[in-house]
Amino acid sequence: MGHRCNMHCTHCHVSAGPREKKQMERETVEDVIAVLRRNEIKSIDITGGAPELNPHFRYLVETAKALGTRVVVRTNLTVFFEDAMDGLPEFYAGNSVEIVASLPCYTEAGVDAVRGRGAFQKSIQALGTLNGLGYGDGSGEKRLSFVFNPAGAFLPPPQCRLEDDYKRELQRRFGISFDSLYVFTNMPIGRFRDILIKNHSLEKYQSELERSFNGRTLGGLMCKDMISVGWDGKLYDCDFNQILGLGLDENYPRHISELDVMRLIGREIRVDEHCYACTAGQGST
């Protein structure tokens, strides 16, 4: 829904931050809703930046839910404490929104190193509130999941093992529970790419991704069963292509207002060297 965010994380492939101005306008939101009305789209995944900072965010969530669409929101948790965010956890619970929260570590030092001082304590406080509203209780009614990205230019550890570590440590230290954890490899784009260049490690990291290619990941790639809608309504195969400006091929719809789902069947997906991040090791889904 835009690049504006209350945080300025070092690994952010969107290069989001408090000063970013790119925001989805109401007209584009209405185009998204029109597509949901016309098609049997089962779910919508809302992201940013911090999508909650878009003034049309709650309208999109409520309208999508009213249409029977599964709504997933990617949140950084700390946005709960920003101005005008009062009642946000209750809004999520009242609409049975699935939450996928970014939490790069289960320790304060690990989180604050990536997201800034105080981010961890705010995240834990937000998670406690969500647990109190029934999120992450294992019933599946209010799902709470985490996203993990490595803190540097290396591949993440196995997802199952890391999920066990997160569940054990967050429960032991803070009484926090959640449903699942998703592991993503850092994309060599956006702000993370800038850091790689600054540290003279871009070529080394790209080579590591290519050496770690795993053909078994291809069946589960996100670009094969989703479409990414940019803040301006332009269409992409995935969120990462969106950041790079790699829109759908000219033979397919290029803007959400033109979207015909049937025309996307069997489409050719645009790829480039950054795609190795999704196919490296255990893969990213």
Locations of regions flagged by a protein language model:
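Short cysteine clusters
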Residues: 5, 9-12, 223, 238, ...
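Flexible mid-to-C-terminal extensions adjoining Fe-S/redox cofactors in radical SAM and related proteins
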Residues: 234-285
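Residue-level signal for mature regions of secreted extracellular proteins and peptides
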Residues: 2-5, 216, 268-271
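Conserved AdoMet/S-adenosylmethionine-binding subsite of the radical SAM
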Residues: 54-184
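Conserved alpha-helical substructure of the radical SAM core
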Residues: 2-48, 52-69
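A generic local structural motif
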Residues: 30-32, 84-88, 262-264
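Conserved phosphate-coordination/catalytic loops
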Residues: 23-27, 121, 269
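A C-terminal junction/extension of Radical SAM enzymes
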Residues: 138-238
